[in-house]
Amino acid sequence: MIKNNNMIYLEIHDTKDGLKTFNCGTKYDWYLIKKEKQNNNKTIIIDDKNNKIKMNISNMKYIPNNNIELYYKLFGDNNLVYDRCYTHSSTKKTVSKIENKEFKYKILHSTTQKGERYLYSNNNKDGLFDKSKIMFGDSGINNCVIDFEGKIGCSEHIICLKINSKKEGNKIKNILENKKFKDFINACSWSNYQINWKIFKSLKNFDEIKKILDI
């Protein structure tokens, strides 16, 4: 839609505006599009903080809810994330809440402010076992788990980023858990409030992210 037409105007609204407008706690946007070639035209945008900017969005894969000009600098062509894995989904019979002799393979299910929550599988096939990774829940980046040895699997609610060493894992963990990066992720939270794991398929590397956000 954006690439094939000229988006003249875009307004982004948060849940507070949703309550005022629709009596419903939902985010919403509205926009004005002209059926013509984009030709690198600039779009007037009012973000959900009521900031007004004018910029070319034709090459943007995602439009954050706010601070768009800054966050535009973070997007790149590095695929930092493993594809989402559903092998050990929490609803499957091969997964249990209780660890025992049969269900002995640890599965990370969530990372809350209070700590990690684990499930247990009766097998360690797929599920990103044997992959070096840093892991966190899709409901919020808290208490990231570094699994360089690949001993832990993941449920459907875990995002796993690629790492090459424990040192790199710790560096990425510090960036992920920094408030500035969390603000970026929150600005990219849309309909269901879950973190969109695909964002990590199109970012700059973490050294560049750290520099841009001044972490």
Predicted regions and their residues:
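Signature of N6-adenine DNA methyltransferases within the class I
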Residues: 1-95
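Polybasic, glycine- and aromatic-enriched phosphate-binding surface used to engage nucleic acids
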Residues: 68-215
